[in-house]
């Protein structure tokens, strides 16, 4: 929740007047429970979506996630049906993605070209599987945590939100 990448995307949403909720998955930080291979984390995401819809019923839902959270938010999108989806350096090599359908949402993927954890080529191949393909923004030289590149990440998210 306090990750600088997550904070940067949340700030872009807030600059568009969108309410935001950031949270830790089970077993992270002060959250109860333990890691559940993505299954429980999808349920965590859907619980937060339900709370957000109850608090802001008129707001269009945007899901965003970074790395493992990028995978979880994409899988949760099948149930939550967001208007927009932002996936930052999503963990696309997970088996859960082998047969996933493209979400109906407007979809942005932001990937660092020099990501040392999630290979850029894997994300590009993943994005190319879908029709229509998601909007893919590759930041040259950016690593997994976008050190020194957060303004460009923010700009990509901000521009996507302005156009979708």
Model-derived features with residue positions:
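Post-His helix in hydrolase/transferase enzymes
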Residues: 147-160
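Alpha/beta-hydrolase active-site loop signature
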Residues: 25-29, 92, 143
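Short alpha-helix in the alpha/beta-hydrolase fold that links the catalytic acid
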Residues: 119-128
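Short beta-strand/loop motif that positions the catalytic acidic residue
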Residues: 103-111, 115
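Catalytic histidine neighborhood in serine/cysteine hydrolases
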Residues: 129-145
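Acidic catalytic loop of the alpha/beta-hydrolase fold
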Residues: 113-118, 145
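Primarily recognizes the serine-hydrolase "nucleophile elbow" in alpha/beta-hydrolase
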Residues: 43-105
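Serine-hydrolase catalytic machinery in alpha/beta-hydrolase-like enzymes
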Residues: 1-58
